[in-house]
Structure formats: structure tokens, C-alpha cells
Amino acid sequence: MAVFLLATSTIMFPTKIEAADCNGACSPFEVPPCRSSDCRCVPIGLFVGFCIHPTGLSSVAKMVDEHPNLCQSDDECMKKGSGNFCARYPNNYIDYGWCFDSDSEALKGFLAMPRATTK
């Protein structure tokens, strides 16, 4: 009887599932990004970005192509003329990196940053 009442109560009173709020500024080093694992942080600078919902990933791919420093490979950095090394963000929610010259001090500082950890 109790199981029947529990089952019928979920049918009669469905719970509303809230969509993640994927707005505002974020850091590509923040895990999870934008305070939700349902969102992604798209860098617009080395340490700052904006939150999006993954349904907008086609626009993100276009933005990565057009941004001079966002990359997915060393070759892409060389094609864009932004460096010769694509340093990946230490965040498994971000599928791209930032272009650097392989002998630059900025790259050494970027690589010295602590790796983000998932909880």
C-alpha cells in the first residue's frame, strides 16, 4: 500500500526539474564551471570567460575558430599566428587551450598553475 501511494504521488505531483543557470562570468580554472556541471566556461581571456549551456556548442566552435588565442592543436596556433604551442586548460570541462610561444614566460606561468580537480 505504501509503495502504491508513493508511486501515485510522484505521478500526481511531478517535480519540476530546473535548468542550470548558465549566465555570467566564469574562470576556465573553476571546477565545475559556472557553479554547475551542466554549463561550460568559454574563455575570452586567459583567466576569464563567460558561461554557456552546452546546447550552444556550435557557436562555441565558431568562436574558437575566430578567437586568435583559443586552440585545439599546436598547428592551429601556428595557422592563427598566435604562437606555436597550444596549452590545454587543466579543466576537463574545457576542450581547448590557449596559444603561446613555446619559449615564453607566460607559458611557464600558465603551466605552473595548479591543476583543477574534480570533486
Curated annotation (Swiss-Prot):
Domain text: The presence of a 'disulfide through disulfide knot' structurally defines this protein as a knottin.
Molecular function (Gene Ontology), one example: nutrient reservoir activity
Propeptide stretch(es), residue numbers: 57-64, 118-119
Post-translational modification: The C-terminal glycine may be removed from A1b.
Disulfide bridge positions per record: 22-39, 26-41, 34-51
Protein name stated in the entry: Albumin-1
Signal peptide span: 1-19
Organism: Glycine soja
Domain of life: Eukaryota
Keyword set, alphabetical order: Disulfide bond, Knottin, Seed storage protein, Signal, Storage protein, Toxin
Role description: A1b binds to basic 7S globulin (BG) and stimulates its phosphorylation activity.
A Pfam family this chain is assigned to: Albumin_I
